[in-house]
Amino acid sequence: MATISVVINTLNAQRLLDDVLESVKEADEIIVCDMHSEDETIEIAKRHKCKIFYHERTGIVELARNWAMEQATCDWILVLDADEIVTPELWQYLKNYAQHPKKNRNACYIPRETYLLGKHVHSWRQSGIKRFWKRGNCYYTNEIHKMPVTREGKDFWINKNGKLKNVALIHYHIPSLNHFGVRLN
């Protein structure tokens, strides 16, 4: 049976971390790679029995993501931001895909629905964000906000036609103007 590691990089991520971790509670392994948070992030991760690792703050998350993925021990890796929730339908899809992957399709793009200031932003719906792959098959470059590079095989777009209801990541981006101001600083 194929196993799934979830990798989440955090920095002062207490706002949604309980919900994020609850959404992947069935994972075989949850790795939280923290960049020395100063809020309740670590306490929340401990309550969810995550494997906790620390990485220095580098200015971009990609370096820490690569390092965190090296700590994963399962067959497949799902990378999440600390403000992304996996729907039950997506989790079931990923578990099934890990058991029966499409031939030579070793990395998957997942649809992502974004909420900004509490409202769904329909025009920001992406056809997919590459976040699920066989362990060791993808890595991030040192460029911020770039998709990871696939080493072997081709990429697969999950639910590209949108026919599968609720098979998506839910991204709660910038919940308030106050939060937006904090992010700018």
Region roles according to the model:
Residues 15-18, 39-48, 89:
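Acidic helix N-cap motif at the loop->helix transition within catalytic regions
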Residues 77:
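Short aromatic/hydrophobic "clamp" motif used to bind/position activated sugar donors
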Residues 63, 69, 87-185:
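Catalytic-site signature of metal-activated, phosphate-bearing donor transferases
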Residues 3-5, 29:
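Cell-envelope/extracellular polymer assembly enzymes that use nucleotide-activated donors
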Residues 42-71:
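Conserved donor nucleotide-binding strand/loop of the catalytic core
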Residues 26, 48-49, 128:
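Short, structured coil segments at secondary-structure junctions
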Residues 7-26:
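Short, well-formed alpha-helical segments that are part of the catalytic scaffolds
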Residues 23, 34-44, 57, 81:
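A conserved acidic beta->alpha catalytic loop
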